[in-house]
Amino acid sequence: MKAYNILLFCIMFCLSVSIHAQKQIVFVDEFESDIKVPQYVLTNIRAAVIDGIVNTNRVQVVDALTVAPNSEHSPMENALGYRAGYLLQGKLLNREATDDGFSGRKFHSRENSYKEKFVLRIQLIRTSDGTIICNRNYEETGSSGGKYASQYHALERALVNVPYEMRNFIEQYFRVHGSIVELVSDNGKKAKSVYINLGYDDPIKEGQRFDVMVQTSMAENYMEHKIGEVRIKEIVGPKYSLCKVMSKGAEDILKAIELGSKLHIVSSQSRLFDE
């Protein structure tokens, strides 16, 4: 009996490992700079990029600065060493930090005004064959004014949009697919709620939106087109989530379900979450 329990534990552990392995692993290399900048600038930019990626819950991030990879190996070798499917590299191409403050006439006062502008190149490489999946530049700007303004605060303002950019980045290259498996409720004309076959085991979050796609055929060619959207209301199990059907397209979704059509869902790029 004891041996049976041990065997059962091992099986469940292996299943757990395989489940969590569904998330793609992204190895984030140390960022470089083509120009001389204070270290805090590169550190904060990189941290904002990583935070934005991690908060999507879409991929597993391995931070090169945290795991201390082998310095004798190339970034690609280190990424493969951590079984990462992708290598992400960043390079600061340009930075403009300006102090536009001016002195006032009264009491020799000074109005502080700082501006920050930088261009960062993000490169995503597939480790299996070295293919560059993405090579894109991001330009961000920010400013800080007033008595307590500083260049650091201007940089913080410039980083505000980075999480949103990274969310779109991850959504573009790591989309999630699933299906509607059951109609939960309707009002006779429109679908109100459904179950989808994605849950705790998948890289999803409550509030996340999905496009609902139905397959059609034309001249013996099959294609999919969007008929509506659903939003995750509650993740209820390893492979199930309760979703609210958004009003636009809810009638078409109900008709498709009643006809027995298979409805494919794919994470939406237009609006990922309700916030």
Which residue stretches match the model-derived regions?
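Positively charged n-region of N-terminal signal peptides that target proteins for export
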Residues: 1-6
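Bacterial N-terminal signal peptides
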Residues: 7-16
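N-terminal segment of the mature soluble domain
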Residues: 23-91, 131-135, 204-208, 213-220, ...
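Surface-exposed short loop/turn segments
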Residues: 75-125, 235, 271
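Anionic-ligand-binding alpha/beta catalytic cores of soluble enzymes and soluble regulatory domains
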Residues: 145-185
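Glycine- and charge-enriched low-complexity intrinsically disordered segments
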Residues: 237-275
